[in-house]
Amino acid sequence: MKTEQINSKTEVIQYDSLQEFYDYLINTPFNQAFCWSEHGSVTGSKSFTKTESFSEAVELFKSGWSDMASNLVQRLKVIESKTEPTMKPRNKLDVCGYQAIVPLYIQGVPNNMMNKKMVPVKQKVITINKSLDYNGMTSSDKIIEESIKAMQIVKKLEAQGFRCNLNIVLGTTAGYGKNEKQFVVKVRIKSANEKMNVSKLAFPLVHPSMLRRLFFRFVEVYPNVTKDFVGGYGHPAHSSELRKVFAGEYLLPNFVKKDVSKINTIDDLENV
């Protein structure tokens, strides 16, 4: 866990893994602001969270959301089948080609011709932050729909050779004037050296309870949270605010407006 005070208003809290985030939630007592207040992480309805209880959300977090994982595998296969990796020509010696290598020909070496072979381009490592900043009026089904888009985009980029770090982020703000506070929570759910594990990612990336139970629990336990967050858990940070915090990285906003089928390169991630 790393914390950084960006300014008097904004504090960024980063977790290097889902396990580190979970351990913090489970082992940290309720903060002073929420100690005697209602805990939305517990009382949230099934229609709002898609789970019956906090315990059910934790179980899905630990064991995986198998129903959605099966659905996602099929969707991602379609995405992968329509995506071709970026290729570049590479010279190689061959028995036939466009130019003879005379010394090799004289020596009787069979591979005495210069030819070209198309090989995948090794792409750079990029970091993508998926915003889970949905307000209370956003339906749980809409959260699922938008979050699936994020997984499809990452799959397309990796099929082209990009290596993606993937984070989920929550930015929440409450208070006014000098008392205004903003907390930006960033959780690494996939490292660039990992292949996409749909079973592992289905719950934290797609399930509404990741926001409405587990991230709510973070607000309930993090010591610096003030009483202004009680009740509504703050209001979502704007995408422009998150982009400033994560300069040099890519942001997938809560609502992706572009057609996912038209997002093919990292250049297409601008203003999605």
Regions found by a protein language model. Give the residues of each.
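Acidic, glycine-rich A-domain
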Residues: 1-62, 123, 134-139, 148, ...
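Internal, hydrophobic cores of structured domains that mediate oligomerization or house catalytic pockets
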Residues: 95-169
